[in-house]
Amino acid sequence: MSNHAAGPTTNDPTNDPTIKALVARIDQDADPNHADITPAVEQLGELGPKVIPYLGDALNAKDELTRLHAQRALERALERHFGFVPGQGWTKPDGEARFRALWIKNGNYDADGAEPAREASIKAWLTWSSTQRS
């Protein structure tokens, strides 16, 4: 599953070199106490849903740890979108419920789930993200 066009265009949702670089480093320097978290996972999460088109390949990678890192980046990006602030919690009264409902609606992505289920969820997330651009 490739998210890359033949060449970058202004309509290409994956032409941000900073986000591309973060995804390329998604597996580097995992937290020794939390192997599912890396600096790139956290930085991607801070950027919100605009990172979703960049995560498609990592969410469907052969390596399960890469998929898990991509899942955590996706979760954090969505949590931020729905009002979660580290150290403060959910800042919108319905933020957590909306996050969880959307997660389920878009296939309940699971890094160690079956490939067909992952692919269906990835497709749903890519479709959803295409409706979120400002």
Residue positions per predicted region:
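Structural detector for internal amphipathic alpha-helices that build alpha-solenoid repeat scaffolds
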Residues: 2-3, 7-12, 31-49, 57-60, ...
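Positively charged, low-complexity intrinsically disordered regions
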Residues: 5, 73, 81, 99-101, ...
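Amphipathic alpha-helical scaffolding segments comprising HEAT/armadillo-like alpha-solenoid repeats
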Residues: 12-27, 49-60, 81-91
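Short coil turns that connect the paired helices of HEAT/ARM alpha-solenoid repeats
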Residues: 27-35, 59-65, 90-100, 112, ...
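Leucine-rich solenoid repeat scaffolds
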Residues: 75, 79-91, 101, 105-111
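Eukaryotic acidic, Ser/Thr-rich intrinsically disordered low-complexity regions
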Residues: 109-134
